[in-house]
C-alpha cells in the first residue's frame, strides 16, 4: 500500500485535526494531518494536507466529495508532491532500475479491478411498483446507515462500489423508453435525400472549376482570349482537313517562329475615329473581355467628325500675310499683341501693397537734397577743370607693404582702426572748437518773450490783483512794460549789427537758444533770491501810499453801507406802532 497526500480547501473554521482523522480512517491508515489557517481580507481560510495509506486514491476523492463536514461540502483533490517526496521517489526508482526490478506502474497495472470487472450485473433499475427483498440484493449494493444521508444526489440514492468510480445503482421514477428500430421505407427515403444533396454539391463544384479554368486562360497583361468564330458548314468542312495536316506535320523541336505566326494582330483604326476609340478605351478597365471596339463608335459621330470644317483664317490675317511677303519683314499691328483678342485685355490696377507696383510711384525728393545735388554738380565741374589742367595723372592702384619679420607685422595690427583718422580730424581739435562756441554763446543775451516769461514766472507780480484799485495802478505799471520793450528792441539791434558769416547753407528762420545756461541769466538770480532767507526790505514811501489807499477804500465801503440802511424817523414810527 502506497501513501497518498490529499488536499482539502475551504474548510469550516471550527475544523480540527481529530475531525479529519475520523473522516479519513475509513479509507486507510492516516499517517499525517497538517491543518493550516490564513487570514485574508478579515476572513480566515482553512486548508489541510492529509497523508493516508490507500490502494485507490481516486476512489477516496470521489466518495469524499459527497460527504459533509460541519454542514459544508468538502473540496478534496490529490495534492502535488512536495519537493522532498519527489526526490525520495526518484532515488528509489533509480535504485530499482539499477537492480533490474520492474517499476511500480508496471506491477500495479494488472491488479486494477476496474478493467477486469464488468458492470452489467452490478447496475439494476427498479420500477415504482416493484418490491425487492433483502435476499435478492447483493451485499455490495447495500448502504450503511452512517453514509445514507450523504448518498442523496438530486433526489436519487447513489450507491458506489469500492472499486468503481461511477454510480452503480440508481432508483428512477420512470423507465427509459427503448429505442425503436427505423422503418425500411424511412431509411430508403433518407438515402435518396443524401444522394440528391451530393449530386447538387458536385454540380456546384464543377461550375466553379469551369469558371476558374476560363479565368486562368486569360492573362492579366491583356492577352487575347479564345474566340469562337461562326461560319457556314461548307467552310468548316474545308478547314478541318487543313488543321489535321498541320497537326501531323509538327516537328520534334518546335521553333519560336511558329508561335509568332499564331498571334493575331487586330487592325487599329486611324484618324479621328481611332482617336475617339483610344479616348473611350482609356476610361474603361484593363480586362480585355470588356475592351471597347470600333463597333461602339456611332456612324453619326463619325459623320459629325468628318463634316466639321477646318478653321479658316480670317480675311484680315490673309491680307497681312500677303503684305508681309511683299514688304519682306513681319508686321505687328497695334490690335494684335501676342495673338490675344482685345476682349481679353484688362486694365492694369495700381496696388501699393504689391512690390512690383511700388516702382510706378513717383518719389518726391526733399528740397535740401535737390540743393545738394546742384552744389555737387557745380563742384564736380570745377574738379573736372582742375583735373584737366594737371599734367601728370596719379594711378589708383593700391599698394601693400609686407614685412619680413612676424614681430613687425603683429605690432602694426595692434594699432586698431579709427574712423576719425580716415574721415575726420583728431578729437582734441573738436573739443577745442566746442569750448570756443560755448564761450561765445555765454556772452550773448537771450531774448525771452512775454508768453515765455509768464511760463517761467518772470512776469511782474501784482499783489493787489484782487483789489478794486487796479485801475489806479495801471498808470504805474505801463511805464515799466514800455521800458522792457525798449530793452528788447536794443538787444535785437545789437544782434543784427553783428556781421553774419557767409555759408553755402541757408540760415534757419527760428532763433536757437544755447543748451547751457549762461551766468548772466535772470532766472538764476530769481532762484537765488527764492532760496535766500533775508528780511524783506520795506519802502516807507510805498507803505504810506498803500496805507492811504486802504483807508479810502474802507471809508467808501462804510458810506455805502450807511446809505443802504433805513432812516431814524422810519424806525421811530415802526416802534410806536409796535407798542400800540
UniProtKB/Swiss-Prot annotation:
Residues found modified as Phosphoserine: 231, 468
Segments for region (Disordered): 89-131, 173-211, 254-316, 333-395, 463-520
Superkingdom of source: Eukaryota
Polar residues bias: start-end ranges: 110-120, 386-395
This protein's GO CC annotations: nuclear speck
Domain RRM: 4-81
Comp. bias (Acidic residues): 254-263, 298-313
Pfam families assigned to the protein according to its UniProt record, in alphabetical order: RRM_1 (PF00076)
Keywords assigned: Phosphoprotein, RNA-binding
Biased composition annotated in UniProt, kind: Basic and acidic residues: 89-100, 348-358, 365-377
Stretches of the chain forming a coiled coil according to its record: none
PANTHER family named among the record's database cross-references: NUCLEOLAR PROTEIN 8
The name this protein goes by in its record: Probable RNA-binding protein CG14230
Species in which this protein is naturally found: Drosophila melanogaster (Fruit fly)
Amino acid at each position: 500500500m502506497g501513501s497518498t497526500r490529499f488536499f482539502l480547501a475551504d474548510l469550516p473554521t471550527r475544523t480540527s485535526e481529530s475531525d479529519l482523522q475520523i473522516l479519513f480512517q475509513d479509507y486507510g491508515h492516516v499517517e499525517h494531518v497538517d491543518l493550516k489557517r490564513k487570514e485574508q481580507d478579515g476572513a480566515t481560510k482553512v486548508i489541510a494536507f492529509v497523508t493516508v495509506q490507500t490502494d485507490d486514491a481516486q476512489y477516496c476523492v470521489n466518495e469524499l466529495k459527497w460527504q459533509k463536514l460541519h454542514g459544508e461540502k468538502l473540496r478534496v483533490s490529490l495534492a502535488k508532491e512536495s519537493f522532498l517526496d519527489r526526490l525520495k521517489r526518484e532515488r528509489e526508482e533509480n535504485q530499482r532500475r539499477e537492480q533490474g526490478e520492474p517499476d511500480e506502474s508496471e506491477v500495479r497495472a494488472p491488479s486494477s479491478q476496474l478493467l477486469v470487472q464488468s458492470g452489467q450485473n452490478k447496475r439494476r433499475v427498479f420500477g415504482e411498483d416493484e418490491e425487492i427483498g433483502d435476499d435478492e440484493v447483493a451485499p455490495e449494493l447495500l448502504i450503511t446507515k452512517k453514509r445514507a444521508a450523504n448518498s442523496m444526489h438530486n433526489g436519487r440514492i447513489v450507491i458506489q462500489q469500492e472499486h468503481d468510480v461511477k454510480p452503480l445503482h440508481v432508483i428512477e421514477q420512470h423507465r427509459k423508453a427503448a429505442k425503436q428500430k427505423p422503418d425500411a421505407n424511412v431509411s430508403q427515403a433518407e438515402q435518396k435525400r443524401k444522394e440528391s444533396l451530393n449530386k447538387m454539391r458536385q454540380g456546384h463544384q464543377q461550375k466553379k472549376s469551369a469558371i476558374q479554368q476560363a479565368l486562368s486562360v486569360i492573362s492579366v497583361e491583356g492577352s487575347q482570349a479564345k474566340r469562337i468564330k461562326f461560319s457556314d458548314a461548307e467552310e468548316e468542312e474545308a478547314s478541318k482537313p487543313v488543321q489535321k495536316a498541320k497537326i501531323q506535320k509538327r516537328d520534334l523541336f518546335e521553333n519560336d517562329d511558329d508561335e509568332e505566326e499564331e498571334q493575331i494582330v487586330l487592325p487599329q483604326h486611324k484618324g479621328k475615329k481611332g482617336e475617339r476609340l483610344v479616348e473611350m478605351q482609356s476610361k474603361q478597365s484593363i480586362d480585355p473581355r470588356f475592351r471597347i471596339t470600333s463597333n461602339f463608335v456611332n456612324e453619326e459621330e463619325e459623320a459629325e467628325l468628318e463634316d466639321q470644317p477646318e478653321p479658316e483664317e480670317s480675311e484680315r490675317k490673309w491680307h497681312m500675310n500677303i503684305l508681309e511677303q511683299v514688304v519682306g519683314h513681319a508686321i505687328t499691328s497695334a490690335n494684335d499683341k501676342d495673338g490675344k483678342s482685345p476682349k481679353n485685355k484688362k486694365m492694369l490696377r495700381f496696388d501699393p501693397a504689391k512690390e512690383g507696383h511700388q516702382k510706378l510711384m513717383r518719389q518726391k525728393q526733399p528740397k535740401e537734397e535737390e540743393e545738394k545735388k546742384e552744389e555737387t554738380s557745380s563742384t564736380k565741374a570745377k574738379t573736372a577743370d582742375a583735373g584737366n589742367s594737371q599734367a601728370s595723372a596719379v594711378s589708383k592702384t593700391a599698394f601693400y607693404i609686407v614685412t619680413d619679420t612676424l614681430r613687425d607685422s603683429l605690432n602694426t595690427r595692434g594699432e586698431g582702426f579709427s574712423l576719425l583718422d580716415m574721415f575726420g580730424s583728431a578729437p582734441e581739435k573738436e573739443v577745442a572748437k566746442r569750448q570756443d562756441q560755448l564761450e561765445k554763446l555765454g556772452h550773448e543775451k537771450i531774448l525771452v518773450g512775454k508768453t515765455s516769461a509768464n511760463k517761467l514766472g518772470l512776469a511782474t507780480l501784482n499783489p493787489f490783483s484782487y483789489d478794486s484799485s487796479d485801475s489806479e495802478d495801471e498808470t504805474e505799471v505801463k511805464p515799466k512794460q514800455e521800458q522792457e520793450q525798449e530793452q528788447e528792441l536794443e538787444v535785437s539791434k545789437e544782434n543784427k549789427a553783428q556781421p553774419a558769416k557767409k555759408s553755402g547753407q541757408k540760415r534757419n528762420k527760428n532763433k536757437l537758444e544755447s543748451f547751457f545756461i549762461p551766468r548772466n541769466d535772470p532766472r538764476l538770480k530769481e532762484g537765488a533770491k527764492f532760496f535766500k532767507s533775508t528780511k524783506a526790505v520795506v519802502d516807507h514811501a510805498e507803505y504810506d501810499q498803500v496805507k492811504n489807499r486802504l483807508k479810502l477804500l474802507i471809508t467808501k465801503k462804510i458810506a455805502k453801507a450807511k446809505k443802504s440802511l433805513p432812516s431814524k424817523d422810519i424806525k421811530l414810527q415802526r416802534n410806536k406802532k409796535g407798542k400800540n
